[in-house]
């Protein structure tokens, strides 16, 4: 995140795009602040806070990939005060980008929405020529946190067209 973020910021400065560079700095600092304040948090956070973080974090990717990537948020207001473990969306957004070939030939889309008490993250799949197998650690850790805090597993749906993760929300 650090090196990629600095490269994107450098690009904006070289392009003399002051407005976007300043917004990028704001979103980057918010992202780092959220991660540092909530990284050791073993309780819950309101969905509204996690979504605010996800919007800032996704902005960093939108600058890096320009018109090749889109993030769609559709959050029902009735769920904004529901809870989930903090930093649940970061590994899902990061994995979506990491495991797909993002190019100007087609739009890569990540949808984040609520559905019957779940927060859902879904992305279309564009396989890479040389797949990045990853370790699966991000999803494993996220599932472990849900089991520890909620005694519930996250739901993973992986088909040919889409990769979907459903996170249970807690009404408190």
Give the location of each predicted region:
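Two-component histidine phosphotransfer core
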Residues: 1-168
